Each structure stands twice: as structure tokens, then as C-alpha cells.
């Protein structure tokens, strides 16, 4: 999609966006920027890269560092998974729901177990990388579980005797199947969010509004294409 680029000379400041440095969310984010005719060289994977035709700086970070970077003002805006945004609890504003990188946070247990309901987790040990979301969910439902916080390879925990069940991201469910686990409760659905620090100056707000206009144009074009195909 082509947009008329008059912004390099119009603005003195640059908007800084924090994005995930690798993985599915990185790929989806770069695709969105490309569709919005914002040219960022993916080959220059340094920490900070400037778009060649739009007043935007791209700051590459780990996904769990993005909410804090936006809340603290290191970045003006960021694209992050809703799961990470909710887990971190940082004070940033949700500007837009982007509709990609969709997944869910779910409870799963060994598939050989006949699951009677949420009360099964009372007194059980649950491995997760999202303790805050899980703790709030368990408190809401009056479940007293032992939350064991680990990073990475959460799905192997029941198989090695580390936990009775897990609370983790699920996309296709294939990872659960390969580890003999069954998804029993969907706690939260997640997608990519555009978050922002509203302490930006007026000029940066104008740049942000232009970016949002382009993102909406991309979505509208995708919707029309989908309708035509069906």
C-alpha cells in the first residue's frame, strides 16, 4: 500500500516505537509497518533503527521489556502481546488492538487425568511464566494453588514431576499435544496491542495519528480483500 510521504521535512521530532526483537510478533509487526508503507530495514538489526521514509525510530527489545519502556518514556509507543501487557501491569495506555499474533493463556493438565472442573487445581502445583495473571484468576475463583514460576519450557513441567499442571500461552495446541497435555481452561485471550505513553508532545501525537490512519487503511484493505475472496 502506498502513502504520500511528506513527513521527513514536516516534523522535527521522531516517534519511537518499541517492538519485539524476534519471533512471531516481530514478523507480524514488520509486516504491518511494510503494509503501511513505513520502511524499516530488517537487515540493520541494531538496537535502534530509523525508518527511511517516516519520522519513526524502531527500538528492538524483549517482549517483556516493552511495557516498562513505554510506561517510563524510553519509547513513546510499543507493540506488545496483551498477555505481557497485563502480566507486567505497567501504566501505559492501550491505543489500538491490532488483531494479529493471537493466542490464549490456558490451564493444561496431563491428558490421562479426567478433569472434573476448576476445583481440581486446589492444592495443586502449577508451573507458569505468568504468575500475576494466574494468581488473580485463582483468587477470583477461590482456588488455593501453589504457583511455581519458571521461564521457558513450561510445558515439560508435569512430565518431569515439577508441577501438576501448567498455565501458558497456547496458539495451535500442538505443543500441548506433543507433551501429553490437555487444555482444560481458557483464562485469557490475547492479541497484539499498540500501547502508548500519553506524555508525548503534540508533534509526536500528530505522527502517531498518521500512523494510526495508515494502520486502519491496511485493515480496511485486508477486510475488502477477504470479502472479495468469499
What are these regions (language model features)?
Residues 50-68:
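Active-site-flanking structural segment that lines cofactor/substrate pockets
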Residues 11-56, 80-93, 97-104, 111-230:
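Small-molecule-sensing regulatory modules
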Amino acid at each position: 500500500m502506498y502513502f504520500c510521504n511528506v513527513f521527513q521535512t514536516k516534523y522535527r521530532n521522531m516517534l519511537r516505537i518499541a517492538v519485539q526483537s524476534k519471533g512471531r510478533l516481530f514478523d507480524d509487526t514488520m509486516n504491518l509497518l511494510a503494509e503501511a508503507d513505513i520502511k524499516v530495514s530488517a537487515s540493520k538489526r541494531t538496537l535502534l533503527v530509523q525508518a527511511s521514509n517516516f519520522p519513526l525510530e524502531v527500538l528492538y527489545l524483549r517482549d517483556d521489556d516493552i511495557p516498562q519502556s513505554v510506561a517510563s518514556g524510553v519509547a513513546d509507543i510499543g507493540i506488545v502481546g496483551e498477555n505481557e501487557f497485563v502480566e507486567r501491569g505497567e501504566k501505559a495506555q492501550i491505543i489500538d488492538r491490532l488483531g494479529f499474533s493471537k493466542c490464549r493463556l490456558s490451564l493444561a493438565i496431563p491428558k490421562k487425568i479426567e478433569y472434573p472442573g476448576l476445583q481440581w487445581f486446589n492444592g495443586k502445583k502449577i508451573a507458569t511464566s505468568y504468575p500475576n495473571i494466574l494468581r488473580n484468576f485463582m483468587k477470583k475463583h477461590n482456588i488455593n494453588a501453589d504457583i511455581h514460576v519458571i521461564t521457558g519450557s513450561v510445558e515439560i513441567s508435569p512430565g518431569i514431576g515439577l508441577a501438576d499442571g501448567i498455565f501458558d500461552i497456547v496458539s495451535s495446541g500442538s505443543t500441548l499435544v506433543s507433551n501429553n497435555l490437555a487444555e482444560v481452561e481458557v483464562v485469557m485471550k490475547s492479541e497484539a496491542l499498540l500501547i502508548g505513553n500519553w506524555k508525548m508532545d503534540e508533534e509526536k501525537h500528530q505522527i502517531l495519528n498518521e500512523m494510526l490512519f495508515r494502520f486502519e487503511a491496511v485493515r480496511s484493505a485486508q477486510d475488502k480483500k477477504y470479502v472479495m475472496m468469499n
